[in-house]
């Protein structure tokens, strides 16, 4: 039988299989078993009571986390004229139109988020095969195709997260770093859940938020007692 590493043994000793954790306890367990040499992200998986086979039950949106994600985000904006100036003033890292499109086609994807003014979609529309598979294609539903590019840039820089249900009806999202205090992680999670509930499809039946699981990059997944959350 293979011997457990020290890290895995620590996880095995501190995590009770099948237990549903109060949210504060869940974060404290993740912190206690974190022993890697980098600052892990804290992620959440939310199982929703939707039928992922039905397009009208797909859940897609964006949430500005009150305490951000702990990540530095590079933002590219497709815009011109006054919109381009507003994007730069708001802190965008790269702004352009056809020139930025040429960079993307050349494989220069030096950004984490792409925002587009509506009149820039003639350029962005040609980049779907490049941006789409990377989750970077701007979309009105996530606020990344908008006439107010300045606000979109500020939101992205402030720690906005974008999400959509996968083939199993699950939302996956980062809610911060393991170095955040538990209260900040909890508030980020509650902000996400509040927005998810606003996005509930009218055709979804039964329990909407079925299960919440939090985990760290290299840590275990812990089921969360929803009654310990405000959202």
Swiss-Prot record:
UniProt cross-references to CDD domains, sorted A to Z: Ribosomal_L1
GO terms (BP aspect): regulation of translation; translation
InterPro entries assigned: Ribosom_uL1_bac-type, Ribosomal_uL1, Ribosomal_uL1-like, Ribosomal_uL1/biogenesis, Ribosomal_uL1_3-a/b-sand, Ribosomal_uL1_CS
Tagged with keyword RNA-binding: yes
One Gene Ontology cellular component annotation held by this UniProt entry: cytosolic large ribosomal subunit
Keywords per UniProt: Repressor, Ribonucleoprotein, Ribosomal protein, RNA-binding, rRNA-binding, Translation regulation, tRNA-binding
Assembly information from the UniProt record: Part of the 50S ribosomal subunit.
Similarity comment: Belongs to the universal ribosomal protein uL1 family.
Official protein name in the record: Large ribosomal subunit protein uL1
UniProt organism field: Methylococcus capsulatus (strain ATCC 33009 / NCIMB 11132 / Bath)
């Amino acid at each position: 039988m293979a011997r457990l590493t020290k890290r895995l043994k620590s996880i095995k000793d501190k995590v009770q299989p099948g237990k549903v954790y109060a949210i504060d306890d869940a974060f404290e367990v993740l912190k206690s078993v974190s022993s890697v040499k980098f600052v892990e992200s804290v992620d959440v998986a939310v199982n929703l009571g939707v039928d992922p086979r039905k397009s009208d039950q797909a859940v897609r949106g964006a949430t500005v986390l009150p305490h951000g994600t702990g990540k530095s985000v590079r933002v590219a904006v497709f815009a011109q004229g006054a919109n381009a100036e507003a994007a730069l003033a708001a802190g965008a890292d790269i702004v352009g139109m056809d020139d930025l499109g040429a960079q993307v086609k050349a494989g220069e994807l030096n950004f984490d988020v792409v925002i587009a003014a509506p009149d820039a979609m003639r350029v962005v529309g040609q980049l779907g095969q490049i941006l789409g598979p990377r989750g970077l294609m701007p979309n009105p539903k996530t606020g990344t195709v908008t006439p107010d590019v300045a606000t979109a840039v500020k939101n992205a820089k402030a720690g906005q997260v974008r999400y959509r249900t996968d083939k199993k009806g699950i939302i996956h999202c980062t809610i911060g770093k393991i170095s955040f205090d538990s209260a900040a992680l909890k508030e980020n999670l509650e902000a996400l859940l509040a927005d998810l509930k606003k996005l509930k499809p009218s055709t979804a039946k039964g329990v909407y938020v079925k299960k919440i699981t939090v985990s760290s990059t290299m840590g275990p997944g812990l089921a969360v007692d929803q009654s310990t959350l405000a959202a």
